Amino acid sequence: MELPSNLLPDEASPEWMNKGDNAWQLTAATMVGLQSIPGLVILYGSLVKKTWAINSAFMAFYAFASVLLCWVSWAYQMSFGEKMVFFLGKPNVALDEKFLLGKAFLGNFPNATMVFYQGVFAGLTLILIAGALLGRMNIRAWMLFVPLWVTFSYTVVAFSIWCPDGWLAKRGVIDFAGGYVIHLSAGVAGFTAAYWVGPRADKDRETFPAATNNMIMVLAGAGLLWMGWSGFNGGAPFVASTIASLAILNTHVCTAASITVWVMLDTFYFGKPTVFGAVQGMITGLVCITPAAGVVQGWAAILMGFISGSIPWYTMMVLHNKVNFLKKIDDPMAVFHTHAIAGALGGILTGFFAVPKLCRLFYMVPDWEKYIGLAYGLQNKGATQAGLKQMVIQIEAIVFVICYNVLMTSLICLIVRVIVPLRLNGDALQMGDKAIHGEDAFALHSEATKFVNIKRNQVYDTQDFSSIPESRSLGELQMV
């Protein structure tokens, strides 16, 4: 039986390419992109005080654009290209037609798809770092920090863990979709950069939800983040397979469990549940399951949700207020707790719950000496040593990511502050968006609201609308 003409290989659809896999990978990449733009843009712009809404959203928006430009120019090849040293690839462009239309190093789709998919992950990582720096970092310093960090920090961790030639990848570390590469890195780097930049002005350090300017929009941004995680974890196998389906289901089950536990703890200890708490529980659940999504069973995903909803809650709500060092570092979006702590937890729990069969299906290797969770190693005679080894590798990767990011992020901050101040000056800290961008996110609330009649181009400097002709409708008025 002959195949339909649209399924036959041709120059645009080579024999090696699977159209279904390619379509899913592009969809997954777009979903991850939507987590950033507009997901985190909305979330950041809504969680901060209204005087910092524009700046917070802009930092995320700029980071995404800047990273993608660096990514195709040199960073992709440094992360996944030909090995230069054991932890880094050779810098090179990823824009050549011959390269982009060729087969990716994994999956049955072209390099162009892989470059885009991995690029949106890199962009998201920098936006997560921004969450620890909102409300006081000099925007010019941020514009320098972004390309430097993606070049000298992200690429090293990505190559080491995700590239087949990376030293931790060869060791057998399990990081299904970025618990180490993205979340642990972002949490540690954000916390380190926050140390160097310093805290926000006292007036801006109100606790949530008092500082939040629009809680409904917080939920909108959080919803985009949550649903976009279907592409985040579901695209990790690089194939539209059963493992992708399992990863997506585990992601949402773990997240639901984490939210439930966090909200219950808030209710028990503080007397009432909060939207802010639910969103934090959502993030910790999503982060914790990320390194394990497609290689653990459903019941393990629920247990991981219980743990991710409780331990980060304790470190954030209790321990943070008791440890002087933690109190001194201003982390507006609690990136350290929701990403560094939750990411490290996820990595350790992955080493415990990873199912050998699922790992074999994901990594497509017959090597049973690797990728064996400790829980399964203890159940099988002769595999205990392999399970213990896997836990050691997982912890080894955590130590590497933490140490490298603290060192490199500190070095980048020190270099940037030689060029421009890391921190905004006093006037800008007091004024916020108006001083930095000359824009106001909430013009209706401005003390100097002005209305312009578009047809006559007349400006009314008063809130008394009696001077406006009755024939003019509000639809013809525009705020300035």
UniProtKB/Swiss-Prot annotation:
The lineage of its organism: Eukaryota, Viridiplantae, Streptophyta, Embryophyta, Tracheophyta. Residues 49-51, 135-141, 197-214, 264-274, 320-334, 416-480 are cytoplasmic. This is Ammonium transporter 2 member 4. The gene is AMT2-4. It is a multi-pass membrane protein. Residues 1-27, 73-113, 163-175, 236-242, 296-298, 356-394 are extracellular. Its main location: membrane. Involved in ammonium transport. May be involved in arbuscular mycorrhizal (AM) symbiosis with AM fungi. Keywords: Ammonia transport, Cell membrane, Glycoprotein, Membrane, Transmembrane, Transmembrane helix, Transport. GO terms for molecular function: ammonium channel activity. Induction: Accumulates in roots, in a RAM1-dependent manner, during colonization by arbuscular mycorrhizal (AM) fungi (e.g. Glomus versiforme). It is found in: Cell membrane.
